[in-house]
Amino acid sequence: MRIGLISDVHGNLPALETVLSDMPDVDTIVCVGDVIGYNPWPAACVERVRDVASVTVQGNHDRTVRTPETYRGNQMAYAGLEYALEELSEDQLTWLDSLPRKATVGDDRFMIVHDHPEIQDRYVMPHMFSSLWSYVEEYDGLALGHTHVQHKEVDGGRVLVNPGSVGQPRDEDQRAAYAVLDTETVSVDLHRVNYDIDRVINKVEEVGLPKRVGTRLLDGS
């Protein structure tokens, strides 16, 4: 089975649509969390992900959209959640509430979780990936997100992968990121694709979100 992995869409519809158009043939798509937050298309992204993804796990922004004050100390995150709460329908909010923290795919051989497998909200940066192997001893692999940094490691027929962020990369590469996992060969390909960032910047200004939400996309920070 070939699985398209998307993560950290964060309300960036132009990036999401470009990724879906660029993605090679896959059997299914899995979303590794944080459909909303930051960028100005939360409702459209929820609907698109609901339509294309067979499995979606809950990210921290998905989990806290009803309580934006959780991120009051982070202006961009707080503003994005407040905006999302206004824009999303009750049905969409209920769907985000209902998402599981973890899931399995590929005949239950691959674990999907937004952040750390056991410690909610913990960032697992590339240099920390080796610490994850003990959590996936009974699996062929693990896909996680949260850091917005694309990375993979393969060892002994098992794979760890962060597909990177569709909607807000933070690895100094402005291109939208995603990955394709092959569960038969236990291998993963990382992908990047350019999209219309100016469209996001203009929409951010139009709806009154902090300007930096848009301009940070230019340098992948």
Annotated model-derived regions:
Residues 102, 112, 178-180:
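Conserved hydrophobic/aromatic beta-strand scaffold that supports enzyme active sites
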Residues 72-79, 108-137:
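Active-site-proximal segments of metal-dependent phosphoesterases and phosphodiesterases across multiple
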Residues 1-4, 105-111, 155-159, 184-187:
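Beta-strand-turn-beta hairpins that frame and shape the catalytic cleft
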Residues 1-3, 10, 16, 210-221:
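Haloarchaeal acidic low-complexity proteome signature biased toward cell-envelope/secretome components but also
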